[in-house]
């Protein structure tokens, strides 16, 4: 994404976040953004809205489906996106909106990659430790399995990264032998 487009994405995202806080509608808008992003994930909507050969009217019609079930603030936002012919950046704007909300309330998802599934007790303990060590509030734990780790785990949250996997320890050991 070029700098001009990135600046547009940031401008639209910050505007929606500001409205959410001004109107005390943060939780509503967060939920609506998540629902719209779920639709993006389950369909090829991002590709459709990015197509140059798709008319503005077709893009506007696609966005109107969201407007039927969204708050007035989200409706207005989607209307501005449509009127300014910016549907092609909507996905990136919405992703950034969630990031900005996370930064604002210091709440983040925690991604844990391990060689085998974690028990519920391990997940609970891990969330508590991550919350304390990273000084964040944890929203939820996203668990991924990667058998190539051999053992241990990799934690990602708030742009921080902790790798205690046996694979990385073996790689570090290998580098020290050189």
Swiss-Prot record:
Coiled coil: none annotated. Its main location: membrane. GO terms for cellular component: plasma membrane; proton-transporting ATP synthase complex. GO terms for molecular function: proton-transporting ATP synthase activity, rotational mechanism. Gene3D superfamilies: N-terminal domain of the delta subunit of the F1F0-ATP synthase. It is found in: Cell membrane. Pfam families: OSCP. It comes from the Bacteria. It is a peripheral membrane protein. Signal peptide: none annotated. InterPro entries: ATP_synth_OSCP/delta_N_sf (IPR026015), ATPase_OSCP/dsu (IPR000711). Keywords: ATP synthesis, Cell membrane, CF(1), Hydrogen ion transport, Ion transport, Membrane, Transport. HAMAP family: ATP_synth_delta_bact. Belongs to the ATPase delta chain family. F(1)F(0) ATP synthase produces ATP from ADP in the presence of a proton or sodium gradient. F-type ATPases consist of two structural domains, F(1) containing the extramembraneous catalytic core and F(0) containing the membrane proton channel, linked together by a central stalk and a peripheral stalk. During catalysis, ATP synthesis in the catalytic domain of F(1) is coupled via a rotary mechanism of the central stalk subunits to proton translocation. This protein is part of the stalk that links CF(0) to CF(1). It either transmits conformational changes from CF(0) to CF(1) or is implicated in proton conduction. F-type ATPases have 2 components, F(1) - the catalytic core - and F(0) - the membrane proton channel. F(1) has five subunits: alpha(3), beta(3), gamma(1), delta(1), epsilon(1). F(0) has three main subunits: a(1), b(2) and c(10-14). The alpha and beta chains form an alternating ring which encloses part of the gamma chain. F(1) is attached to F(0) by a central stalk formed by the gamma and epsilon chains, while a peripheral stalk is formed by the delta and b chains. This is ATP synthase subunit delta. The lineage of its organism: Bacteria, Bacillati, Bacillota, Bacilli, Lactobacillales.
């Amino acid at each position: 994404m070029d700098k001009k487009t990135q600046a547009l994405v940031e401008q639209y995202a910050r505007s929606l976040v500001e409205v959410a806080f001004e109107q005390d509608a943060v939780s509503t808008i967060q939920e609506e953004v998540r629902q719209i992003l779920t639709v993006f994930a389950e369909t090829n909507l991002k590709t459709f809205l990015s197509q140059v050969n798709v008319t503005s009217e077709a893009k506007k019609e696609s966005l109107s489906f969201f407007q039927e079930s969204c708050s007035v603030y989200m409706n207005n936002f989607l209307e501005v996106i449509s009127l300014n012919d910016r549907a092609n950046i909507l996905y990136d704007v919405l992703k950034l909106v969630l990031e900005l909300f996370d930064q604002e309330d210091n709440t983040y998802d925690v991604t844990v990659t391990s060689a085998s599934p974690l028990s519920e007790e391990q997940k609970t303990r891990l969330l508590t430790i991550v919350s304390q060590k990273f000084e964040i509030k944890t929203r939820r734990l996203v668990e991924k399995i990667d058998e190539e780790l051999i053992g241990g785990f990799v934690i990602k949250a708030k742009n921080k990264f902790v790798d205690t996997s046996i694979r990385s320890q073996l790689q570090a050991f290998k580098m020290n032998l050189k």
